[in-house]
Curated annotation (Swiss-Prot):
This is DNA primase small subunit. One of its GO terms (cellular component) is alpha DNA polymerase:primase complex. One of its GO terms (biological process) is DNA replication initiation. Belongs to the eukaryotic-type primase small subunit family. The gene is PRI1. A motif (Zinc knuckle motif) lies at residues 123-133. It comes from Saccharomyces cerevisiae (strain ATCC 204508 / S288c) (Baker's yeast).
Amino acid sequence: MTNSVKTNGPSSSDMEYYYKSLYPFKHIFNWLNHSPKPSRDMINREFAMAFRSGAYKRYNSFNSVQDFKAQIEKANPDRFEIGAIYNKPPRERDTLLKSELKALEKELVFDIDMDDYDAFRTCCSGAQVCSKCWKFISLAMKITNTALREDFGYKDFIWVFSGRRGAHCWVSDKRARALTDVQRRNVLDYVNVIRDRNTDKRLALKRPYHPHLARSLEQLKPFFVSIMLEEQNPWEDDQHAIQTLLPALYDKQLIDSLKKYWLDNPRRSSKEKWNDIDQIATSLFKGPKQDSHIIKLRECKEDLVLMTLYPKLDVEVTKQTIHLLKAPFCIHPATGNVCVPIDESFAPEKAPKLIDLQTEMEKNNDVSLTALQPFINQFQAYVSSLLKNELGSVKREREDDDEPASLDF
């Protein structure tokens, strides 16, 4: 069942209550500070606040978790966003020369939005999202997770629900935070393989696939039939199939034959059309060249699996160290959903809503008894692991610095 999208989100007093009683400031502080004790990583961190009036205030920074909580409560923004760690506190920006304030580091971030899958989802459209089309996001998370772990060696990353129709990935490994803008673009280029969102032409990816792409294909193939051909069934619409499925094939004779067959036999399901491709190709291509046609057809179908299911990233979010991104546990102003940490098993209806949390608090006045607590626990466990790894990294750096200089050539 499709979730309806509310246009009347939380009120100013709702947000005031949320920041005062429910928002996990301490865990967010420890995450961004990489230590329970205030350090440069938090004191020099930029925060931006967005208000229901349309105002947007950048270059806020906080000295402690108490200051963080007090300032957010006082300002009561609709949401706040997290930016880079600078060489000086961003709040001092007006007293500095423009060249004096420099961004040093920030988490490597990725953003996946359902909009980029609209050509292939039929269960919902626009701002709507349900558990069926959310599978596109879950698969994108799976592929990205594998690349981050196996290809880049990152350990400390977490996904956060955007509150409506997307997900954000925060990579907090020390190596990732220190990436330059050029290096961030290099990582992006590696992961963002399917750059062309144009569905009316063939991908024609080079063979052999890069190992990452070959691995991704094997991860995605088991889901293609159930998600694309059965649940979404986008190509049952004959014109849509002619516009987005046929251009992915390589042979004009095959394309013309399929087009005629589908117009003569309308409303065949996506699964039937997928099988039609093989059957008509077999009848057309016989003799000594049949094997080469079979190989080309298989490659076209592999490209289609990747075109439909491979992660579609919002590239601007990843490119720059200074880019700001909405903080975890913010409230989406339109839906009232909490932007909670998630994993591949998440579905959007699992996200707690502020209105429900307020009802739970009225009964118990205890955050630990609300639907928010399991997500806070999940985030706390992530932060604890990050701090442990951060401490280990600092110790290794100190040990390296303490090693005596060698006279060996």
